[in-house]
Amino acid sequence: MDNALIADENLKKPSKPAYYGTAGYRSKTSDLNNILCRASLIAYLRSTTFAGKIIGVMITASHNPVEYNGIKIIDHNGDMLDEVWEEYSDRIVNCDDEKLAREMKKILRSCSNQSELGEGVRGHVVLGRDTRDSGERLCNNIRSVLGKLNCTVDDYGVVTTPELHFLVRKCNTENRVVDKAEYMKNIAHNFNSLSSITKGNLRMMIDTANGVADMKLKELDGMLDGKLNYEVLNDPKGILNLDCGADFVKTKKRAPRLEALSSSGFSQAANRICASFDGDVDRLIFFTGPKDTEIFDGDSQAVFLALYIRSLLDRIESRLSIGVVLSYYSNNAAVDVLPPESFKVVMAQTGVKNFVSAAREFDVGIYFEPNGHGSVCFSQACIDEIEKGSTKSHAILKILANLFDPCIGDALANFVIFKALMGSADDLRKFRENPSRLLTVKIVDKNSIKVDQKNQVIEPKELQDKIDVEALSLGGRSFVRPSGTEDVVRVYAECPSEADADLLCLKVAQHVYDMCNGIGDHPEIDYTSK
């Protein structure tokens, strides 16, 4: 077995180190195949050391350009991979070829498993992928690698990332490989139930990011007998994430570059609201347009849901706790609109796990990142209470608890929820955002900047002093942090005016460039794309 692993070309050591970030591994280099195949070994190890529970392997690079791909490992309960196993994965991905089998055995022994590789409890892994051309080949190579370890592999084919989370969770709950259709049946059934109560099914235009969303919307519409009430704006031949998708809309602060957006049909459509997904359907951004584009990001979605769910709890006279978990990138106006006597607002560090763990501290925990990734967590105490009631408010809460994914943001589930609850774009206009600006700076080593839990720079301390002076002079706030998914430093600034927000962001970005060995072009704002 050891020799078989060493001889496998798919398992050769990558030329550069790779590390499991907030979105798993992502790359566009020639090492991509080997990084993903080595990382898939962790899914086998996690399964065989945990009574053969089914572990998920999702091949996707989400909102990244089409030439990228990546891998996310899904734990037995549908959660993201535990941090301890992330560290194990980095060891497996980056070790020398002759040490690969030895490192795998070390992990087995650390889990009190004395079996040899490929022996003992049989591992079980399920695969899924997005629509990238490279996905099928990568899945086939992973299947080949895992086959050498006597690991059972089932392939769900093209799925959304949240769909695979759902399927893994359901597989282990029912102790069987469930049919792929179970996911869509759950959404269709609950959407039908919710819209029949609220009488809502807001028509929306859709930006699919030229990704898997198009396929899944057609599948869902088929189950709903053509009643989903939507229109896709993308060209069927469009390139994944190119000038479109949730990340493009959010970061560029503009509507996607789609020919259909300039049509008279869209400009005259009632409410003119569009939902923009990302490549693997775990992010959702709403916008109006195409002219005078107004963007409703994760902050707007969180505030709408918080106020709506609060009203439901008030109607049933519930004393359940309700919390809203936002990001340090969230706009201060979103925090200010939530009354402190009704909500506990918590700020979480970037990374989905941080948001989910904070949300689970409440009976109802609403969490959203500004990028449109978010969900609502319901405690068992909350579910028990709402199950006892028979009012309309109880019924809506029961359905929401079934639709919102408890482990990860599901943009498709969120989409149908908003369709059923909203009457128009006005429902998302709960506050007026303070002007803000986000820039990225490339430096020699992004990890040379150390920040604490509140995004205060610890090293170099002089950088934080500069940030404080600039923020005070312009009456705003700003912070910097190394990106968890890209080799850049992110700079955020927020001020009472757009001009000051831009100026503050530029000044801080320049300090980062000057003090931390910036490389390439100096920071600047491109206004030509507006």
UniProtKB/Swiss-Prot annotation:
PROSITE patterns in the record: PGM_PMM
Chain sites annotated for binding substrate: E369, P370, N371, R481, P482, S483, G484, T485, R490
Listed cofactors: Mg(2+)
Residues where Mg(2+) binds: S62, D278, D280, D282
Keyword presence, Zinc: no
Record-linked Pfam families: AMG1_III (PF21404), PGM_PMM_I (PF02878), PGM_PMM_II (PF02879), PGM_PMM_IV (PF00408)
Annotated InterPro entries: A-D-PHexomutase_a/b/a-I (IPR005844), A-D-PHexomutase_a/b/a-I/II/III (IPR016055), A-D-PHexomutase_a/b/a-II (IPR005845), A-D-PHexomutase_C (IPR005843), A-D-PHexomutase_C_sf (IPR036900), A-D-PHexomutase_CS (IPR016066), AMG1_III (IPR049022), PAGM (IPR016657)
Any one GO molecular-function label of the UniProt entry: magnesium ion binding
Taxonomic superkingdom: Eukaryota
Documented EC number(s): 5.4.2.3
Gene Ontology BP annotations: carbohydrate metabolic process; cell wall organization; UDP-N-acetylglucosamine biosynthetic process
PANTHER family: PHOSPHOACETYLGLUCOSAMINE MUTASE
Family: Belongs to the phosphohexose mutase family.
Protein name as catalogued: Probable phosphoacetylglucosamine mutase
Organism: Encephalitozoon cuniculi (strain GB-M1) (Microsporidian parasite)
Lineage, uppermost ranks: Eukaryota, Fungi, Fungi incertae sedis, Microsporidia, Unikaryonidae
